[in-house]
Regions:
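Short, charged/polar surface micro-motifs in flexible loops or helix N-caps
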Residues: 35-36, 48-51, 213-217
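Cysteine-centered loop/knuckle micro-motif
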Residues: 16-20
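Unchanged
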Residues: 59, 72-75, 92, 96-265, ...
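Short Cys/His-rich zinc-binding micro-motifs
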Residues: 3-14
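Short beta-strand scaffold segments in enzyme catalytic cores
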Residues: 26-30
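Entry beta-strands of beta-propeller and related beta-repeat scaffolds
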Residues: 40-41
């Protein structure tokens, strides 16, 4: 009998849904030090905000969970707020997944319930003596994010993939930068980002450090399905640009980015000598 294998932590003896570890992702912080006093790293802007995806998938349990729905809506970009008001659910679902025929079966099963909940909110409902609809809920959120979340390239492991293999593959999928374009710094312990999301799920992101061999152009490749279905834009950012672009509630993300820059500024010459 084949031993149970967990595709989250990579250990045997249990399966993914019984794993006690946080949801694990692996990525690479790739830096360019060709201008020593202006070191930059690769950052990506998500195609869709996390909260936007959660809302369309109906992850608020009930349309009467007003506070949580408003929290999700408050983290939409300006474009996402306009999009969700202007389109019906089927169009939004198609835009979200793009290739709907290849959606994970588990996500595909969410479609009917998600659509019903969305339409109930959009059409309007009464709760505790007050009327709500999607337009009014959005109008009660005053955030004006001009972009979606910026973050470090990362992702979850494939079956039987080790941590480093996962990081290299996910980084290439999201950036189009292959492992031949950079050196992984093997004598540096990966940086860890760990937090609990607003959905009360624990996450842990493990980032290896890579140094680009020579500056390379960053762009969205429309031939790379793994990239254009998840990434809206990609850029080289210095420390100040990272802190400006990362949203204020993502303090855990800012922390790991600043830890990286502080470490590199102190140790980059030693790294280059090894």
């Amino acid at each position: 009998m084949e031993r149970k294998y967990c595709n989250n932590c990579g250990n045997f003896g249990h399966i993914y849904k019984h794993c006690r570890h946080p949801i694990l992702s692996y990525g690479i912080i790739l830096y360019d030090d060709s201008i020593p006093d202006n070191i930059k790293i690769v950052m990506i802007e998500r195609k869709d905000s996390i909260s936007y995806i959660e809302f369309l998938r109906g992850k608020y349990k009930s349309h009467t969970n007003i506070d949580y729905i408003k929290l999700l809506l408050s983290r939409f970009s300006v474009d996402e707020k306009q999009r969700i008001i202007s389109n019906d659910f089927d169009e939004l679902w198609k835009q979200l997944w793009i290739h709907t025929e290849t959606i994970n079966p588990r996500v595909k099963r969410e479609y009917t319930i998600s659509k019903r909940n969305f339409n109930r909110i959009k059409d309007g409902f009464e709760y505790e003596g007050k009327s709500y609809n999607l337009q009014s809920l959005i109008e009660e959120t005053d955030t004006l994010y001009e972009s979606n979340e910026w973050e470090l390239p990362k992702g979850r492991r494939n079956l039987r993939e080790n941590n480093r293999e996962c990081a290299i593959r996910e980084f290439q999928e999201e950036t189009n930068i292959t492992h031949t374009n950079y050196d992984l710094i093997t004598n540096i312990v990966p940086l860890i980002e760990e937090y609990t999301g607003i959905n009360n799920v624990r996450y842990k992101h493990v980032y290896y450090i890579g140094r680009v061999k020579e500056p390379c152009e960053l762009k969205i490749n429309m031939m790379n399905k793994d990239q254009y279905t998840e990434v809206k834009s990609i850029s080289w950012f210095n420390q100040e640009e990272c802190n400006t672009s990362i949203r204020e509630y993502d303090s855990h993300k800012k922390k790991v980015v600043n830890e990286f820059f502080d470490f590199i500024k102190m140790n980059n010459q030693l790294i280059q000598m090894k």
